Amino acid sequence: ALKKKIINTIEQVFINYGFEPLETPPFEKSENIGSFLANDETNPMSDVFLFKDEKESLTLRYDLSAPLSRFVAQNFRDLIFPYKRYAYGDVFRQEKADSARFRSFTQFDADVIGDANEAQVDAEICNIIADSFLNCGLNKNQFTINVSNKKILQGLLAELKVEDQKQYRVLKSIDKLDRIGPDGVGELLKQGRKDKSGAFTKGCELSNDQVSEILSFLNLKKIKELKTNLKNPLSVEGVQELEELLEVISYGKNIDLVKVDVTKIRGLSYYSGFLVETNLNFKAKNVKGKEIEIGSCASGGRY
């Protein structure tokens, strides 16, 4: 009953913002899924459940973005753009389950496709997240909407002359900052890191100077600091887009919930600019009553 109430509450928020519903099957052709997965040099389909019928390979949907892209491609001539759609349903991940990761869970999705003012659309996504959490009963102190822009870090890596083939691994290493801290990230950026279990993860093999510059960048918390310290044109463009986003959000009621955090870079390579990652500011309890950390609860970006 509680889950149904939460679903109905969030759905009404999406409707209030002018989004229309779309339902898609839980299966997709495997060929339609691949480009939406995290890069895995050895097995790009390692995160999904694969099945084969008599004719073709099928995949349980990993998220709701790939089905949307397939739907839009098939119905492009019949849709009115910008096309605003929401969807919810179960998604499936072939990964090791733990306290904050599940192999199956219900996901809500809101996307805007087509030409529109980027800052306004990105701000709308932030406001949808805020209204959804508040309407579900959380107060403003219980969650934070962290925003960043992928161009900022991409520009820095270009400035530091980090080779293209290393850049994705660098981003993945930085994405682990909350879990392993700056020292752990530094190890991953250099030769590698051994975790508590003894498992060794090969590093990115960057130079000491490159690692030092990246770790210094991760300490920048304000727009003014970013504008002062970053000179690469792509980084400057990303900071400007972030500044425009915050200006639009400031006209509404949710600006106090939004925080700039350039360490939030998301794991998927298809993101191209604006990034958002929402975190709870409290610990939850599992079925055994043990306190656990909950990962990102509402995240995404421009792609």
Question: Which stretches of residues belong to each language-model region?
Answer:
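A short beta-strand-loop structural module common to alpha/beta enzyme folds
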Residues: 20-26
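Positively charged, Gly/Ser-enriched RNA/tRNA-binding surfaces
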Residues: 2-17, 28-29, 55, 65-77, ...
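General small-molecule cofactor/ligand-binding pocket signal
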Residues: 22, 146, 258-261
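Glycine-rich, mobile lid/loop segments that gate access to catalytic sites or pores
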Residues: 144-155, 161
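Polyanion/phosphate-binding surface patch
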Residues: 26-58, 101
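Acidic, His- and aromatic-enriched active-site or binding-groove loops in soluble protein domains
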Residues: 42-53, 160-191, 280, 284
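Charged, amphipathic alpha-helical linkers/stalks
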Residues: 135, 159-160
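Phosphate/dinucleotide-binding and metal-coordinating scaffold of catalytic cores
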Residues: 80
